Amino acid sequence: MQAKEWAGYEPEGCHPKELISRMTALSVSELIVTTIDSFHDEYICMALENGFDVITEKPMTIDEKKCKRILETQKKTGRKVRVTFNYRYAPVRSQVKELLMTGIIGDILSVDFHWMLNLSHGADYFRRWHRWKKNSGGLMVHKATHHFDLVNWWLNTVPERVFASGDRKFYRPETAGFYGLKNRSERCLDCPEKKKCNFYFDLNKTASLRELYLKNEKFDGYFRDRCVFSSDMDIEDCMNVIVDYKNGTKMSYSLNAFVSWEGYIISFNGTRGRLEHKCEESVYTSGDESVQGALRPEGTWIKIYPNWKPAYSVEIKKSEGGHGGGDPIMLSDIFEPEKQSEDKLKRAADHRSGAWSILTGIAANHSMKKHIPIKIEELVDNLELP
């Protein structure tokens, strides 16, 4: 529906088996992949093997087996794979990159990174297909790939070893009991507790939700409004990760999906001082026509703490649009390359950056399951640097 409004005509659909023939007939040069995460490798490899370049959303894929398949197919075909890490393009995050590149805090020895998903955006992952790792790889892959890529990019390095601990502590039946929701349904539409549940999700709230999901349930059987307190899911909502990087930097990272505000706090500790950056994002729910990841200026800042000198704030670059203003800049970079000059920040990401970002999360998944540190080379060896 939205594509029709934006493009001015009805988008053409086809069966997956007909995709390559239709692309060939239409003289298409690239395939844009935005399927459920677990299918990314199928379409990426299909396109590469048939001579097409690929633009894919994050995460590039969800496990090391699928990652290897993409890397091997890319190497064999020589075609291009671009991963759309829009967070790199947000002016404030580019500003952090620029500051670090100046050496303002010296060599970076450690990083503390804490990401919060609020009770709207965070809860939404537990309603949808993301709630099963077989579809999404869990939040360590689906969501944190953004965050791990930012650190790889900010520090110009890659991960070597990962140790993680995680659990589902909030989105479970016990929490429904805590809130007095004793007669809940497995979906919101017919739930007897809808009037007193703060997590009630109304599929009739907007035309886009109704048209895209509710009216299509009879065709695909997909329920967009599953109960966030169901026991029928296997992803975590509370995760802590320790990462050792190739350049010697250490990072402590956390992701919590049930916090009262949305955004992150990151601190870089260097030989000459400390850089702190906080970012608050607006409330967002997929499909409700709101802007995803728009910044709240009053809650976004950068501060420098030089060794033995007074701390000071850095004026933030203004931005508009989704993902901190990164979406419009990235879209221009992809679809209007003739307008771009050389990017000294190297924000465009290929299959190598896509692989390094997901492998931190994939290693974290293995570590949470086995309770041991995981080396990246044990998952995918001889991976090229970006």
Identify the role of each PLM range.
Residues 209-255:
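Alpha/beta-hydrolase fold catalytic core
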Residues 1-10, 21, 334:
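N-terminal Rossmann-like dinucleotide-binding module
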Residues 37, 41, 62, 66-71, ...:
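Catalytic cores of eukaryotic secretory-pathway lumenal/extracellular enzymes that build
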Residues 12-18:
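Short acidic-hydrophobic, aromatic-tinged amphipathic segments that line or gate anion-handling sites
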Residues 87-226, 334, 371:
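Predominantly a Rossmann-like dinucleotide-binding segment in NAD(P)-dependent oxidoreductases
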Residues 25-30, 36-37, 41-88, 103:
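Beta-strand-loop-alpha-helix segment that lines the small-molecule cofactor/substrate pocket
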Residues 12, 29, 160:
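Conserved acidic residues
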Residues 235-386:
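C-terminal helical cap and adjacent loop that interface with cofactors, partners, or active-site loops
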